[in-house]
Amino acid sequence: MRNKRRNRQIVVAVNGGKAVKAIFLFIVSLIVIFVLSGVLTSLRPELRPSSDSFYGIAEELPGDVFAHLLQMENHYFASDLSQTDSSFHLSRLSLKLATSINLEDPRSFLGRELPGFAQFDTEILLAGQGTDYTNMPAESPPPSKVMEEEREANLAEIEKQQTQSDNAQKDPPKQTTGDKKVVFIYHTHNTESYLPLLKGETDPDMARHSKANVTLVGDMFGQALESQGIGATVNKTDIQSKLNKKGLNYARSYDESRPVVKDALASNKNLQYIIDIHRDSRRKKDTTATIKGKSYARVAFVVGKKSKNFEENYKIASELHKLMEKKYPGLSTGVFSKGSPGDNGVYNQDLTDRALLLEFGGVDNNLEELQRAANAAADVFSEMYWDAEKVNAASGETKKQ
């Protein structure tokens, strides 16, 4: 009997010790929480964690992480995950969050160490066929000697393409915006040109011209939109000339094109979309696609990461990219965002939530390839536009009822 009582006393003593430890840990936890709360509330506002901070962390996480978190709570999500998405590398994720090094993006190893490397810090939001971090759209300012002496334009090439465009059979559009000009096309880097437009020129850095340049593509795109019943205005303000007169460098181009866009928005209440046309600096193998046996200049969409309208403009660009992939596979190189330190990162896209920046082809593409690209881009844009008009009309009728 005495042995049994001793055993019971020992058990009680052990249980009592666990309870004391639990209470102690609880009190310590409360103290830590109060101390952390005091530290966080005493920090200066700019040092406190904010929703933006957590958004930035979440932005770094790949989508499959969130999919797996949902799967842990609801196993039905597992059926929608492909075999390749069935697991993610925790070690890679930890490395990326701790060091900002992405093993799939070699730029992250040296991006903060090399001066000027941030200019190439473009993010792929949606990749087109064959697009990766080694062949993204690139833009480079013109050498000073290009601005000092004008290259001779290949007028025969330009006249030939314009004649073919004028003689092309065009059916009247089934629907139209009437007299309303709903699209405004402009060219921030208006001197960007293409080597086939310049006589005897082979140096890609010299692909610049005051007349034979990307504004010709703006004309093509505007005319193609008109043929789809969408009223478009093509603005050819010489931004480079304005920079030269004011003694400003090339990086200030958007400062000079901004008033052009503001004036357009203020003077035309029917305006719905503003589109900035550019040319890529890459070579032909990256900027050309063969679709049904015909050669096209590829199209890239760039969204300003620093713009307050980033989400809305990205939605439009992604919709156009997906339509292109469906109707013209390989035409779109993808949707990209830019907004690194030292980069403009806005591109006038803060002025409206329907702003686009399109890059048509690269330095080696000819007018025939560019014309096909402009026609295709207008085709998918018109499909998106008229579908949206139907939805708006239907919602308007519903409100009336």
Swiss-Prot record:
Annotated protein name in UniProt: Stage II sporulation protein P
Region described as Disordered: 131-179
InterPro entries on file: Spore_II_P
GO biological process, alphabetically ordered: sporulation resulting in formation of a cellular spore
Classification via Pfam families: SpoIIP
The keyword Transcription appears for this protein: no
NCBIfam families: spore_II_P
Keyword terms: Sporulation
Basic and acidic residues biased stretches: 146-160, 168-179
Taxonomic source organism: Bacillus subtilis (strain 168)
Record has Cytoplasm as a keyword: no
